[in-house]
C-alpha cells in the first residue's frame, strides 16, 4: 500500500469541526494514561474553522476549502482542519497513523448532533450569559447589590430583588420551552435505528470508553429529562381539551424508520453502461496532483486490459471469526469506518460510500429533498469493486483502504479513491496487483437523504456528525434578538444618563446644603448622615440611584416578555394560518421576535416545496407542426388580469370547456383501445384532437407522427416503474426529474405504458401490445448539457437515438436544410407555451448505423473508464453523436404552484416587500416559475449575470469577467457602485423599478460575492424588482441573505422547507420553515413554522404589523409612565433638602408597576388593533411604516419622555398648591404624617392620568381594555382604603378617610388629569384632522363600513371549503382557506359597494404600490390596467367583441385548439426575450437553426418602444384609446380621469397593435 499522506491529519479535521465543550475530552490509551485537549486549543481551532468558512463563502460561494485546492485532487498538506483522511478495513493501521501507545492518531467527531442551544448542564450558565447581555439586567443586578447596604437607605433588599428574579426566571422558562422542541427532535434523530455491523474490529477509531464526565452528563440528562417528562405528562392531562381543539405543536417530522414492503420484482435492472453514470450537476475532477498517490499510475497504462475487469474487495484467503452480524443500533453510535446496511425508505444516518446494492448493477435511488429541496429521485452507483459484498461475512473478508478528501460543505463535490490488492485473471499465480478506483459524489450517500426504490444498500461511513455535508451547511443555531430589543439598549442608556444627572444634582445639592446649615429643612429628612458634605453627597448619590431606579424600568422587560408570549399564543391560535391537510397551525418557535416580522423589507424564498408543489403536469405538446392541449395556467391568468379581464369568470368558463374536452378525449382513448393503466383523474394532457390524430382520423402521416412521438417519450428516460395493485392497476413512475415522470405518465395515459426494465431493455405496452426495446446506451442529463439521450434498438433492428432537452440546445443540433416549415411552426408553438408559463422541451431523434454505433461505443467505454477528466471526455464523446437530429416535436409542462402563491407575492409586493428566490434548481425552471407566480412579467428586462467555467482559467480572470458584467449593468442605472450610492441605498426603502429583474447562477454568484464585487452586486440587485439566484448551495443562500441584511441594514425573512434552507433561515432576522412530509430540519431551525407559503401574508401583514406597532407603543408608554412617577419624587426633593425621601408610601411604589398601571399597557401590547386583519390584507400598503421603522423612532421616544416630564410637573405641583393652601397644612411645612398625605394627593391623579394617556393612545377600545382601565383606577382607591385601615400602615394609618374627605383632593383628581392630558388631546386632534396618517384615513373608511365586503369575504373564506387538489389554476387565484381576504384586486372587492362608500386610498399608499401607481380613486397612471369600479363600468369586458378580433378563445367545437388568445402577447414578449437562452422565441430559434451554433450566455436587452405596449387590446380598451403617462396625469389632474372616455394625444392618430 502507498504510505499515508500525512501523520495526524485527521486530528486537525476533528478539531476544526467539533464544538467547544464545557470540559476537556479524555483520550483513553493502552497504558491508562490520559491525553487532554485543552479548552483553549479547541476554541482556537473552532475560531480557525469559522474564519475559514467565512472566507470560503466569498471564494466558492459556499464555506468550502480554498479555491486553490482543485476539485478531484486530495491535498496532502496538513493545514489545520483541511487534512485528508485514510480509512483501513480489515487491515492494520500503519505505524505512522498510531501514537506511541498503538492507538489511532486520527480523531473523528461523534455522529451525535445537537441543534439545541442548551443542555441540562449548560442551560443555567449559558442562559444567564445571554440574559445579561441586556444592559438593563446588569443595572438591576447592581441595584440589588446596592440595596443590601443599609447606609444607602434600602428598605427591603429581598423585596427589591424580586423583580429581577422574576424576569430572569420567566425568560429562562420561555427559552427552555423554545429549546425543548429542538432537544426532543435531536434525541429522536440521534436514537433513530440503523443496521450496523457488529462483532468485528474497526481499526480506524479506538474503543469508546465513556469517561466519568460523560457519565455525569448522561446521568444529569436522564434526571432532568425524567422531571420534564413528568411535568409534561401532568400538563397534557390538564390540557386535554385544548389538545383536542388544536393539533400538537410538534412538527410532524418524527424520525421513524420506514418499513414499507419491498417487492423485488420492481427492482430496476440497469444496463452495464450505467456503471459510469455521473448524476451530479458539477464537472468532473481535474487532473490530480502527480505527487499525491490517489490512484495507481500503472493501472492507467493497462487501461485496455483492465477496463472490463470488475474488482473484488473480498480476500477469500483470510480467516474470519464469523461472529459479525448486522444489528440495529442508534445513529449516535455510528463511527467513521463502520459498515452499515440501509433499507428501502430509510434515512441516511451519515455520509456513506456505497459498496453494494440490491441491484446487480449497483444502482440505487435517493431522494435529496433535505439537501437541495428536490423530491425527484437521483441515481447513485455502488463502486464496481464492492458489488460482490452481500453479507456480514463478506464484510469481514473485505480488505481495502479508502483515501478521502477532508470534510467540506459542497453538496455537489466529493473526491476520493479506494485501493485494494487483487490477482488478475491473466496472472492468477502472481503477486496481487494494487488496484484503485476513483470515488465521486455519485458514489456517496449523504446524511439526510432517503433511500428509495432500492431494497437495500451496503456501505461504509466516511463522515459523521458535524463533518457531514448537511451539518456543515446547517451552521449553529443562533440566538436572535428583536431589532427593537437591540435598539432599546440605547434608550436605556439614555435613561441611565438622565438618572445619573438627577443623582448628581441630588448629591451636589444635598452636600452643599448640609455644608451650609448642617441642619435639615422643615420637611422630613430621609437620607443618611455622612459626617462631611462630600461623604454625604456620595451616600446621597447612591441612595438616589435606588430611589430613581424606575427611570430604567425593569417592569418594562417583564411586561415585554408577557406581551410577546401572548402574541405568540395568538399567532398559534389563528385558524387563518391553520393547514388542515397536515394538521399544522402556525407555530412560533422564537417568541421574542414577533415584532421583527412587522419590519421585513426583504424575503428570501426557496422554490421547490416552498413556492411550488413540485408536481409537474404535462399540459401541451406540438407534434409535426401541430399544437395540442388545453390548459389555463397562472401565467395566463396574470396576463388576463393585466388586460383588465375578470380572471375568476374567465377561469370558470375555460374550466368548463376543458372539462368537456377531457370527457371527449377519454372517450376517444377508450374507443381506441382498452388501456388498463388510464385513470381519468390522473390525466393532465387534455387534447381531443390528439386522440383523433392518434386514431388516424386526419391521415396516416399525422397518426404515425403522434405514435412515434409518444414512443419517444416512453423510451427516452431513466424512470423507475412501479405497479400498484388494484382494479384497475396503477403504474407509478419515480424519476430523477419530475418533468421526466410527467412525460412518461402522459405516454402511459395515451397508451404507451412503461412497464419496467428487464434484460437490459425497456418493456412498453404499446396500445395494448407488450414490446421489449433493448437499451444500448443512456447519456445522462446534466445542467451543462441540458439534454439527455437514449440509444435503443427497435423491433425492426434499427438503432435510434432519442434526445430530449432544452429547445435552444436541440435546435442547435438539428440537421441542416431539413424540416424548415416544421421547425418554424414548432418554434412558434413553443414560444406560445413559454408565454403561458410552461416549461418546454424539444424531442428529436437520429438513426444510427451499426458501424457508427460500435465506433462510438468504443470511444464511450474508453472515456467512461478514464481516471482523469472523465466527465469532460464523456461530454466530448456524447457531443459527437448528438448531432444531425430530426425534430419530432415539443412538450410543455406546468410546475404547479402552491395555493395562493401569486396573490401572496402580489400582496407582499404591494406592502413594499421585495421577494428574492434562492433555489438550487436550474435557471430555466426558476424563470418559468417566476412568470407563473407574478415575480416576472412580460414588461421586464431580464438582467442575466453569467460567468461560465469555460470562460476563464484563473480566479482573477473570473473576477474580471464578473466585474465587467456588473459594470455594464450598473451603467443602465447611471451608477458606479461607490460608497455614496450605498449610503443612499441604505436610506431608500422605496420599491425598485418594476421594469428590471435579475437572474444569476451559483457559479457566478461565487465571484460576485467576493469582497471586491459584493457592494456593486448589492446595488445592482437593489435596482431590480425581482432577483432569482439559481443553482446555489445552502451556504450561498446564507451569504446572499447576510449580504442584504448587513449591507443595506434591513430586516430580512427567509422561508424554506428543506435542510438546504437551514443556513439562510438561521442567517435571516426571521426564519420561517414550511412543515410537510419532509424537511423537518428547516422547521427545527426556524423561528416560525407554517403549513403553506400563502400563510406568510397573514403572518407578516397582519400579526407582524400588529406586533411591531403594539410593541413600539407599549415601550413608549412604559417610559412615559415611569417618567411621571420618578420625576414626581424628584420634584419633592426640592423641598426636603434632597435627602432622597420617598414622597409616596412604599406600598404605592411596589403597586405602581404591579397593579396600578401595568395591566392596561400590557393589554395594549397584546390586543390593540389600529385596523382589523381583513383591512390589513385589503390595504397591504399600511405595512410600509414597519419597513421604514416609523412606529418606533428616537423622536417618538423623546416626545413621550418630554410629555412625561411635563405631566410630572402637573401631577406634583397642582396637588402641592392645593395642599399648601389648605388649613390642614402647618405654617412651617408638613410633618411626617403630612408627607404621606401629600403622596396620596399626587399618586391618585397620576395613576388616573397615566391610564387615561394609555387609553388615548389605544386604537381599539373594547370592553376588556376599558375594564382594565377602570379596575386599575379603582384599585388604588381600594388599596388605600384597605391598607390604611390597618395598623400595619404605620404612619399611613387612617390616611384614606383623612384625604378622601377633603374637597381639595377631589378637585386635584379632576384638574390634574385634565391639564396633563389636554396638550396630548389637542395635538392628536390636529394631527388626525390636518395631517392624517394613512391608517387614519383607512380607519375612517372602515368605520363607515367601506370594508364590509372584505370582512364578509374573510368570514366566508374561513368557513368555506378548502380548494380541491387538482382544481384549475385560475380558480385558485382567489382561493385558499384562511387567507383572511377576498382574492380579488382591492377595487374589485368593492364592486357591489356604492360609489360614495368605496374606499378612497390616500396618495401615499397609492405611491407605494409596486405593481401599479394608483391614485386616490384607484386610477392607474403608468403602464397598468385601470381596475377601479368606474373604469370597469366605462369599459366593460365584452366577451363577444374580444372573440371577434384579434383574439379567439379556445372552443371545444374546433378540431384544433386556438392559440390566437396567446398570440396577442407574443409581440410584447419578443423585444425583451429574443436573445435569452432561457426563454423560447421563434425568431431566436430560427437564428439558432440557421447558425447551427449554441446560444450566447448573456442577455442583451434593448426594449423597443412600439404602440402595441400601449394598445387597448391588452388592457381591455378600444384600439383607439391609449394610456396616459404620469406627466399627463400631473398636467391634467385627477379630474381628467373621471370622464367617460379618454382621448388620444391631440394630433396623433391611434396606432394599431402589432399582429
Swiss-Prot record:
Compartments, record wording: Cell membrane; Endosome membrane; Golgi apparatus, trans-Golgi network membrane
Sequence ranges of Basic residues compositional bias: 22-37
Chain intervals with Polar residues compositional bias: 1406-1432
Top EC class for this record: translocase
Membrane topology: Multi-pass membrane protein
Disordered: region residues: 1-85, 257-288, 1364-1456, 1489-1555
Keyword Nucleotide-binding carried by entry: yes
Basic and acidic residues bias (residue ranges): 1436-1456, 1540-1555
Cytoplasmic side: 1-134, 178-491, 559-1123, 1168-1200, 1259-1262, 1324-1555
Residues the record lists as binding a 1,2-diacyl-sn-glycero-3-phospho-L-serine: 1320
Domain of life: Eukaryota
Reactions the enzyme catalyzes: ATP + H2O + phospholipidSide 1 = ADP + phosphate + phospholipidSide 2; a 1,2-diacyl-sn-glycero-3-phosphoethanolamine(out) + ATP + H2O = a 1,2-diacyl-sn-glycero-3-phosphoethanolamine(in) + ADP + phosphate + H(+); a 1,2-diacyl-sn-glycero-3-phosphocholine(out) + ATP + H2O = a 1,2-diacyl-sn-glycero-3-phosphocholine(in) + ADP + phosphate + H(+); a beta-D-glucosyl-(1<->1')-N-acylsphing-4-enine(out) + ATP + H2O = a beta-D-glucosyl-(1<->1')-N-acylsphing-4-enine(in) + ADP + phosphate + H(+)
Annotated Gene3D superfamilies: Calcium-transporting ATPase, cytoplasmic domain N, Calcium-transporting ATPase, cytoplasmic transduction domain A, HAD superfamily/HAD-like
Any one annotated GO CC term: endosome membrane
GO MF terms, alphabetically ordered: ATP binding; ATP hydrolysis activity; magnesium ion binding; phosphatidylcholine floppase activity; phosphatidylserine floppase activity
Essential cofactor(s): Mg(2+)
EC number: 7.6.2.1
Residues that hold ATP according to the record: 606-608, 740, 781, 783, 786, 804, 839-840, 919-921, 1031, 1037, 1060-1061
Example GO BP: phospholipid translocation
Site (Involved in the release of the transported lipid into the cytosolic leaflet): 554
UniProt: Mg(2+) binding residues: 606, 608, 1057, 1061
Low complexity: bias regions: 72-82
Membrane-spanning ranges: 135-155, 157-177, 492-512, 538-558, 1124-1144, 1147-1167, 1201-1221, 1238-1258, 1263-1283, 1303-1323
Homology family: Belongs to the cation transport ATPase (P-type) (TC 3.A.3) family. Type IV subfamily.
Chain's role: Catalytic component of a P4-ATPase flippase complex which catalyzes the hydrolysis of ATP coupled to the transport of phosphatidylcholine and phosphatidylserine from the lumenal to the cytosolic leaflet of membranes and ensures the maintenance of asymmetric distribution of phospholipids. May also transport glucosylceramide and phosphatidylethanolamine.
Protein name in UniProt: Phospholipid-transporting ATPase DNF1
Amino acid at each position: 500500500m502507498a504510505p499515508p499522506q500525512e501523520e495526524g491529519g485527521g486530528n486537525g479535521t476533528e478539531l476544526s469541526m467539533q464544538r467547544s465543550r464545557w470540559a476537556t475530552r479524555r483520550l483513553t490509551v493502552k497504558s491508562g494514561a490520559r491525553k487532554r485537549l485543552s479548552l483553549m486549543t479547541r476554541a482556537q481551532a473552532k475560531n480557525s474553522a469559522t474564519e475559514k468558512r467565512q472566507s470560503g463563502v466569498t471564494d466558492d460561494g459556499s464555506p468550502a476549502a480554498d479555491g486553490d485546492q482543485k476539485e478531484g485532487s486530495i491535498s496532502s498538506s496538513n493545514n489545520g482542519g483541511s487534512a485528508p483522511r485514510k480509512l483501513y478495513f480489515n487491515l492494520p493501521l500503519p505505524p505512522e497513523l498510531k501514537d506511541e501507545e498503538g492507538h489511532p492518531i486520527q480523531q473523528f467527531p461523534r455522529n451525535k448532533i445537537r441543534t439545541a442551544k442548551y443542555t441540562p448542564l449548560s442551560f443555567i450558565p449559558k442562559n444567564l450569559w445571554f440574559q445579561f447581555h441586556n444592559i438593563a439586567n446588569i443595572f438591576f443586578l447592581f441595584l440589588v447589590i446596592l440595596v443590601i447596604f443599609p447606609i444607602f437607605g434600602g428598605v427591603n433588599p429581598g423585596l427589591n430583588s424580586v423583580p429581577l428574579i422574576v424576569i430572569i426566571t420567566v425568560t429562562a422558562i420561555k427559552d427552555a420551552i423554545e429549546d425543548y422542541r429542538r432537544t426532543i427532535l435531536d434525541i429522536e434523530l440521534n436514537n433513530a435505528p440503523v443496521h450496523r455491523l457488529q462483532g468485528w474490529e474497526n481499526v480506524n477509531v479506538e474503543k469508546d470508553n465513556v469517561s466519568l464526565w460523560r457519565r455525569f452528563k448522561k446521568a444529569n440528562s436522564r434526571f432532568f429529562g425524567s422531571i420534564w417528562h413528568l411535568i409534561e405528562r401532568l400538563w397534557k392531562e390538564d390540557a386535554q381539551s385544548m389538545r383536542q381543539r388544536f393539533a400538537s405543536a410538534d412538527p410532524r417530522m418524527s424520525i421513524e424508520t420506514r418499513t414499507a414492503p419491498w417487492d423485488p420484482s420492481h427492482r430496476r435492472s440497469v444496463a452495464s453502461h450505467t456503471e459510469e453514470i455521473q448524476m451530479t450537476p458539477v464537472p468532473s475532477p481535474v487532473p490530480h496532483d502527480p505527487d499525491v498517490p490517489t490512484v495507481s499510475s500503472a493501472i492507467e497504462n493497462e487501461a485496455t486490459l483492465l477496463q472490463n475487469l470488475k474488482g473484488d474487495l473480498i480476500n477469500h484467503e483470510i480467516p474470519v471469526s464469523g461472529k459479525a452480524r448486522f444489528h440495529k443500533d442508534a445513529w449516535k453510535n455510528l463511527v467513521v469506518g463502520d459498515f452499515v446496511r440501509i433499507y428501502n425508505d430509510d434515512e441516511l444516518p451519515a455520509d456513506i460510500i456505497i459498496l453494494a446494492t440490491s441491484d446487480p448493477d449497483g444502482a440505487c435511488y435517493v431522494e435529496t429533498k433535505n439537501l437541495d429541496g428536490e423530491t425527484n429521485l437521483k441515481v447513485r452507483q455502488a463502486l464496481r469493486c464492492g458489488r460482490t459484498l452481500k453479507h456480514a461475512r463478506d464484510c469481514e473478508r473485505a480488505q481495502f483502504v479508502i483515501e478521502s478528501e477532508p470534510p467540506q460543505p459542497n453538496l455537489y463535490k466529493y473526491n476520493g479513491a479506494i485501493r485494494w490488492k487483487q490477482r488478475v485473471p491473466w496472472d492468477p499465480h502472481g503477486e496481487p496487483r494494487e488496484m484503485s478506483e476513483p470515488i465521486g459524489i455519485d458514489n456517496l450517500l449523504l446524511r439526510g437523504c432517503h433511500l428509495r426504490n432500492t431494497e437495500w444498500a451496503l456501505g461504509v461511513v466516511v463522515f459523521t456528525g458535524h463533518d457531514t455535508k448537511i451539518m456543515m451547511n446547517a451552521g449553529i443555531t443562533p440566538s436572535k434578538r428583536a431589532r427593537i430589543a437591540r435598539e432599546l439598549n440605547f434608550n436605556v442608556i439614555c435613561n441611565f444618563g438622565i438618572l445619573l444627572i438627577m443623582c448628581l444634582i441630588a448629591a451636589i445639592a444635598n452636600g452643599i446644603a448640609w455644608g451650609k446649615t448642617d441642619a435639615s429643612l422643615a420637611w422630613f429628612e430621609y437620607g443618611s448622615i455622612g459626617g462631611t458634605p462630600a461623604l454625604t453627597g456620595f451616600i446621597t448619590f447612591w441612595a438616589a440611584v435606588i430611589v430613581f431606579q424606575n427611570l430604567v424600568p425593569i417592569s418594562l422587560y417583564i411586561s415585554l416578555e408577557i406581551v410577546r408570549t401572548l402574541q405568540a399564543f395568538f399567532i398559534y391560535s389563528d385558524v387563518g394560518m391553520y393547514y388542515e391537510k397536515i394538521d399544522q397551525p402556525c407555530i412560533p418557535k422564537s417568541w421574542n421576535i414577533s415584532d421583527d416580522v412587522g419590519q421585513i423589507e426583504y424575503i428570501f424564498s426557496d422554490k421547490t416545496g416552498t413556492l411550488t408543489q413540485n408536481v409537474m403536469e404535462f399540459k401541451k405538446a406540438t407534434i409535426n407542426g401541430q399544437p395540442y392541449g388545453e390548459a389555463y395556467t397562472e401565467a395566463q391568468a396574470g396576463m388576463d388580469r393585466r388586460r383588465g379581464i375578470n380572471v375568476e369568470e374567465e377561469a370558470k368558463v375555460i374550466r368548463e370547456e376543458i372539462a368537456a374536452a377531457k370527457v371527449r378525449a377519454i372517450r376517444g382513448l377508450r374507443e381506441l383501445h382498452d388501456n388498463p393503466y388510464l385513470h381519468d383523474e390522473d390525466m393532465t394532457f387534455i387534447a381531443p384532437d390528439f386522440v383523433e390524430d392518434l386514431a388516424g382520423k386526419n391521415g396516416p402521416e399525422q397518426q404515425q407522427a403522434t405514435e412515434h412521438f409518444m414512443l419517444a417519450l416512453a423510451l427516452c428516460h431513466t424512470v423507475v416503474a412501479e405497479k400498484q395493485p388494484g382494479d384497475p392497476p396503477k403504474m407509478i413512475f419515480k424519476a430523477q426529474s419530475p418533468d421526466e415522470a410527467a412525460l412518461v405518465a402522459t405516454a402511459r395515459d395515451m397508451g404507451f405504458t412503461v412497464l419496467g426494465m428487464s434484460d437490459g431493455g425497456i418493456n412498453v405496452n404499446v396500445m395494448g401490445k407488450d414490446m421489449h426495446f433493448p437499451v444500448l446506451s443512456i447519456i445522462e442529463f446534466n445542467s451543462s448539457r441540458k439534454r439527455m439521450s437514449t440509444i435503443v434498438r427497435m423491433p425492426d433492428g434499427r438503432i435510434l437515438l432519442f434526445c430530449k432537452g432544452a429547445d435552444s440546445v436541440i435546435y442547435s443540433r438539428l440537421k441542416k436544410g431539413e424540416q424548415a416549415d416544421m421547425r418554424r411552426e414548432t418554434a412558434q408553438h413553443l414560444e406560445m407555451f413559454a408565454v403561458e408559463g410552461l416549461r418546454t422541451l424539444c424531442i428529436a431523434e437520429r438513426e444510427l448505423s451499426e458501424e457508427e454505433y460500435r465506433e462510438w461505443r468504443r470511444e464511450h467505454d474508453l472515456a467512461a473508464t478514464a481516471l482523469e477528466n472523465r466527465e469532460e471526455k464523456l461530454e466530448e464523446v456524447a457531443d459527437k453523436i448528438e448531432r444531425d437530429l430530426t425534430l419530432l416535436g415539443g412538450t410543455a409542462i406546468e410546475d404547479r404552484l402552491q395555493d395562493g402563491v401569486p396573490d401572496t407575492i402580489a400582496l407582499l409586493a404591494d406592502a413594499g416587500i421585495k421577494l428574492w428566490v434562492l433555489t438550487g434548481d436550474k435557471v430555466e425552471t426558476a424563470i418559468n416559475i417566476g412568470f407563473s407566480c407574478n415575480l416576472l412579467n412580460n414588461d421586464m428586462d431580464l438582467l442575466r449575470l453569467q460567468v461560465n467555467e469555460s470562460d476563464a482559467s484563473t480566479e482573477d480572470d473570473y473576477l474580471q469577467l464578473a466585474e465587467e458584467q456588473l459594470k455594464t449593468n450598473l451603467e443602465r442605472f447611471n451608477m458606479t457602485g461607490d460608497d455614496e450610492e450605498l449610503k443612499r441605498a441604505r436610506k431608500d426603502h422605496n420599491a425598485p423599478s418594476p421594469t428590471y429583474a435579475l437572474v444569476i447562477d451559483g457559479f457566478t454568484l461565487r465571484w460576485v460575492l467576493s469582497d471586491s464585487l459584493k457592494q456593486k452586486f448589492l446595488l445592482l440587485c437593489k435596482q431590480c424588482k425581482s432577483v432569482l439566484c439559481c443553482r446555489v448551495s445552502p451556504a450561498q443562500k446564507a451569504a446572499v441573505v447576510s449580504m442584504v441584511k448587513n449591507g443595506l441594514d434591513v430586516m430580512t425573512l427567509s422561508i424554506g422547507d428543506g435542510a438546504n434552507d437551514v443556513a439562510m433561515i438561521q442567517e435571516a432576522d426571521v426564519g420561517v420553515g414550511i412543515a410537510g412530509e419532509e424537511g423537518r430540519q428547516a422547521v427545527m431551525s426556524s423561528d416560525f413554522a407554517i403549513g403553506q407559503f400563502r400563510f406568510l401574508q397573514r403572518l407578516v401583514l397582519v400579526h407582524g404589523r400588529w406586533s411591531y406597532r403594539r410593541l413600539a407603543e407599549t415601550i413608549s408608554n412604559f417610559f412615559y409612565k415611569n417618567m411621571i412617577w420618578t420625576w414626581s419624587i424628584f420634584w419633592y426633593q426640592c423641598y426636603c433638602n434632597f435627602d432622597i425621601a420617598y414622597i409616596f408610601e412604599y406600598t404605592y411604589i411596589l403597586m405602581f408597576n404591579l397593579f396600578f398601571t401595568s395591566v392596561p399597557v400590557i393589554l395594549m401590547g397584546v390586543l390593540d388593533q389600529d385596523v382589523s386583519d381583513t383591512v390589513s390584507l385589503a390595504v397591504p400598503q399600511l405595512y410600509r411604516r414597519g419597513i421604514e421603522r416609523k412606529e418606533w423612532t428616537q423622536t417618538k421616544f423623546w416626545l413621550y419622555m418630554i410629555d412625561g416630564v411635563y405631566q410630572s410637573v402637573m401631577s406634583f405641583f397642582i396637588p402641592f398648591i392645593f395642599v399648601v393652601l389648605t388649613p390642614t397644612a402647618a405654617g412651617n411645612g408638613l410633618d411626617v404624617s403630612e408627607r404621606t398625605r401629600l403622596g396620596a394627593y399626587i399618586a391618585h391623579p397620576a395613576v388616573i392620568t397615566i391610564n387615561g394617556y394609555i387609553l388615548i393612545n389605544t386604537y381599539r377600545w373594547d370592553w376588556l381594555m376599558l375594564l382594565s382601565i377602570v379596575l386599575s383606577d379603582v384599585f388604588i382607591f381600594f388599596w388605600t382604603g384597605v391598607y390604611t385601615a390597618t395598623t400595619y400602615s404605620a404612619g399611613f394609618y387612617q390616611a384614606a378617610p383623612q384625604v378622601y374627605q377633603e374637597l381639595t383632593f377631589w378637585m386635584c383628581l379632576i384638574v390634574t388629569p385634565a391639564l396633563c392630558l389636554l396638550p396630548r388631546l389637542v395635538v392628536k386632534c390636529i394631527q388626525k384632522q390636518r395631517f392624517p396618517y394613512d391608517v387614519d384615513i383607512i380607519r375612517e373608511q372602515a368605520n363607515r363600513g367601506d370594508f364590509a365586503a372584505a370582512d364578509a369575504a374573510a368570514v366566508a373564506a374561513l368557513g368555506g371549503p378548502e380548494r380541491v387538489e387538482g382544481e384549475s389554476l385560475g380558480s385558485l387565484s382567489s382561493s385558499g382557506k384562511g387567507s383572511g381576504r377576498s382574492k380579488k384586486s382591492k377595487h374589485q372587492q368593492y364592486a357591489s359597494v356604492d360609489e360614495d362608500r368605496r374606499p378612497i386610498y390616500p396618495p401615499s399608499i397609492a405611491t407605494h404600490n409596486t405593481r401599479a401607481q394608483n391614485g386616490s380613486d384607484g386610477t392607474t397612471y403608468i403602464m397598468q390596467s385601470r381596475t377601479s369600479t368606474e373604469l370597469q363600468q366605462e369599459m366593460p369586458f365584452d366577451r363577444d367583441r374580444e372573440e371577434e378580433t384579434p383574439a379567439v378563445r379556445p372552443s371545444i367545437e374546433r378540431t384544433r385548439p386556438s392559440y390566437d388568445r396567446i398570440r396577442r402577447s407574443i409581440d410584447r414578449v419578443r423585444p425583451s426575450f429574443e436573445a435569452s437562452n432561457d426563454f423560447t422565441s421563434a425568431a431566436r430559434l430560427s437564428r439558432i437553426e440557421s447558425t447551427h451554433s449554441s446560444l450566447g450566455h448573456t442577455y442583451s436587452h434593448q426594449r423597443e418602444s412600439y404602440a402595441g405596449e400601449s394598445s387597448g387590446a391588452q388592457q381591455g380598451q378600444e384600439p383607439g384609446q391609449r394610456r396616459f403617462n404620469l406627466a399627463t396625469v400631473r398636467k391634467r389632474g385627477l379630474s381628467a380621469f373621471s370622464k367617460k372616455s379618454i382621448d388620444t394625444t391631440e394630433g396623433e392618430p391611434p396606432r394599431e397593435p402589432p399582429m
